[in-house]
């Protein structure tokens, strides 16, 4: 029954999209509360986009991890930071961490392409999706909360903007009123803060269990220990550096993306436009925030090694300000050190942002036309066949 209903929704939405392809909807129609994408529809769109992104990006991270592993032996209580602008997680690199190449000696890799070819030949193409998949799957809730929260905040801020700034003559003639870029900026920042705040305690517990293979009883004991030694706020110990890493990126990313849509007069973006705009926006945001990202990556990895992947975490640790860390990095390597890792970061962030936003926008477009079709059907049923 559910399958037939879903197929019916897909057919109805597809027909509505085909009928509307010959005419471009106005901004007033897109912002009409009657046709707005509902939260559950946003969840479905974000979940689909996150899964597609994970499927495409996991091989790149498996290759990156294998290249790092051959440079130095994986040490106990060490970790690395997985971040592509959409998902951000501290991952353990201890001796008990599952390694897809543990069953056979790993060949030497000279680079990304060489690693891709050798891993595919010696271990099978499926091995490129092993190892990091559980981590990526656990990152889906954060991504879903982030994108749904952005859409909700954007709708609320847009309503507030229209309420206090839209002139009566534009309302009477249904004239679109431009939305300032402060709206996507605030929506992106608010959505990211909400997402990392909700997921931070769960992520701390998950990484602790993963690194030490805890049972559920041991997990609750660890939670009690953290609360007793550091208070309830100890569960959010890694929140500040995460927020300081992600908030600038999110604000710049969404502002650039909405700016591109506005500059090209795009109301309902196509898949190709969303893909290109997402890649450009992600690249701009990644480039601008790279110095800050370098500082916060060092801080987050240090936090992971001292507090998450340590059997005896210290109760207190000396803290350094962002300015102090940035100055220290600059003294050691100058400007190149501050922008270190920009190339690999762009290589990951640009496609991840492009895949995620294009998949998300396609899902939104699907449900948008479905809502219009349902509204029209409801009106026809209300008027009756003879009207």
Curated annotation (Swiss-Prot):
User: Is the keyword Transmembrane in the record?
Assistant: yes
What InterPro entries does UniProt report for this protein, alphabetically? Mitochondrial_sb/sol_carrier, Mt_carrier_dom_sf, Mtm1-like
Bilayer topology term: Multi-pass membrane protein
> Where, subcellularly, is it found?
Mitochondrion inner membrane
Q: Name one GO molecular function term.
A: transmembrane transporter activity
Query: What is one GO biological process annotated to this record?
Result: glutathione import into mitochondrion
Q: Which SUPFAM superfamilies match?
A: Mitochondrial carrier
State if Cell membrane is listed as a keyword: no
Query: Which spans are transmembrane here?
Result: 43-63, 128-148, 179-199, 235-255, 275-295, 337-357
List UniProt keywords, sorted A-Z.
Membrane, Mitochondrion, Mitochondrion inner membrane, Repeat, Transmembrane, Transmembrane helix, Transport
Explain the consequences of disrupting this gene: Lethality caused by neurodegeneration and synaptic defects.
Q: Which GO terms describe its cellular component?
A: mitochondrial inner membrane; mitochondrion
Q: What are the ranges of the Solcar repeats?
A: 37-156, 179-263, 269-366
What functional role does this protein have?
A: Mitochondrial transporter required for glutathione import into mitochondria.
Tell me which family the UniProt entry assigns to this protein: Belongs to the mitochondrial carrier (TC 2.A.29) family.
Question: Mind telling me what this protein is named?
Answer: Solute carrier family 25 protein Shawn
